[in-house]
Curated annotation (Swiss-Prot):
Subunit composition and interactions: Part of the gamma-tubulin complex.
Protein role: Required for gamma-tubulin complex recruitment to the microtubule organizing center (MTOC).
Name the UniProt record assigns to this protein: Mitotic-spindle organizing protein 1
Record flagged with keyword Mitochondrion: no
Length: 80
């Protein structure tokens, strides 16, 4: 059982260190997302491909947020 706890502690420490690096580099990845990315890479996903997907999802998220804000602004001006 100690071995399992040691492995969990080591994994948590690794995530903490990678989260610190992520924060310094302004990657905006929380610990949970970072853990998922690490797991995907450990299971064979290409880090470069994963980075591309994360960038694309962020871009789409920003575009969707902008469209929602624009639609809300247009609806607000029509009510006046």
């Amino acid at each position: 059982m100690d071995s399992k706890r040691e492995k969990q502690a080591a994994a948590q420490n690794a995530v903490d260190i990678l989260h610190e690096i992520s924060t310094i580099l302004n990657c905006h990845l929380d610990r949970r997302t970072l853990s998922i990315c690490i797991s995907m890479i450990e299971n064979g996903v290409s880090p470069e491909a994963l980075a591309s997907v994360v960038k694309e999802l962020r871009k789409q998220g920003q575009e969707a947020t902008a469209q929602i804000a624009q639609a809300g602004s247009a609806a607000s001006s029509r009510r006046r």
